[in-house]
Amino acid sequence: MTTDHDGVRDLLAAWAFGALEPADERTVPPHLAECESCAAQAERWRRTVRLLDGPRSYDTPERPASDVLSAVLRTRPGAPRVAAHAAPYAAAVAGLKALLPEAAGRWGTPVVHDWDVHATIAHLLAADEHLARLLGIDARVPPSTIADGAGWTEAWSRRTEDVIAHEYGRSPDETVADWSAQADALLASPEALDAERAAHAVTLMGARLPVADHFVVRAFEAWIHTDDIGRALGLAVPPPPEQHLWQLVRLAVRILGLALGPTAPPVLFAVTGGEEWVLGSEDEPVRAELVLDPLDFCLLIGGRHTADEVPHGATGDRTAVRNVLERAASLAWL
């Protein structure tokens, strides 16, 4: 029964968007008729979809469900037109803005680590600040007192702690307003609008990457924490649109390849439905093959799967496969 309940709960967003598979159409509605909590959650999702999609015109033909979902993700209020590298961040920000009204009266709900919903938004305010400062955007919180020589992991953790402590002295609405304003400023920056302006490399979080890639990192974190908050509130959050998901995957593969280095036992790594890469040494034969679903791979990189539990397919040298999985899991900073 628990498995059936959890399975239906994961389908409620698709139900609200009218995007259920035919087989699910036979199971979800009967469950909603019997389960008061799922029915209430489903109705909240439906209200959100109506708000995002705007008033319906009865003079226009009904669109396929997949088109409805794509349109919602593209046209959520406040999502600006940006260059392709910033589009995943714009969508993730819009998604979190759409979810946060559901947190009203529930800001103290535990989410992840020792954070509640309020603290999770404060963390995102602190996390986005690093890129914002680099792009000349004014800080929304008191200046950092962390010494310049501190390692990035220490600085990252302490800044989050300081900002959370500061934001606990303010209302959740004030924290959300500052996070939202900072995100909007990032998306209005020249670097978000022009790929050429975002091509130069900068060092953030210990990684020297083009500014364009740092926008994708921001998208990754915003989506992961949106999913965290959704789970805490009992709401299923849809994954990123496919194009955006693949941008996250490709960047994560590049970072994983750098982390493994050129001497690691070579593994042919593939993501279901997409590309494949050789990770590790290019000077010796491939020792193993590893296949992951794109969403599971992102959740592994994001610290929401462990190397032991992430679903995967593998052949060949198990030690080489294990090395890739453990290195991927070790990259999580979220």
Task: Identify the meaning behind each predicted range.
Residues M1-A13:
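Short, charge-enriched, intrinsically disordered boundary segments that mark the beginning
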Residues A19-R44:
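N-terminal amphipathic alpha-helical interaction or autoinhibitory segments
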Residues M1-D4, D53-P88, G95-A98:
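Positively biased amphipathic helices and basic secretion/translocation or surface-docking motifs
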Residues G78-I146, A270-G274, V291, G302-H305:
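Conserved small-residue-rich
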Residues A126-A127, R159-E221:
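Contiguous mid-protein beta-loop-alpha structural module that forms a pocket-lining wall or clamp
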Residues D10, D24, G105-A150, A201-L256:
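Short, contiguous alpha-helical
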Residues H5, D283-L334:
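C-terminal interaction segments
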Residues R46-L51:
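Short cysteine/histidine-rich zinc-coordinating motifs and their immediately flanking basic loops
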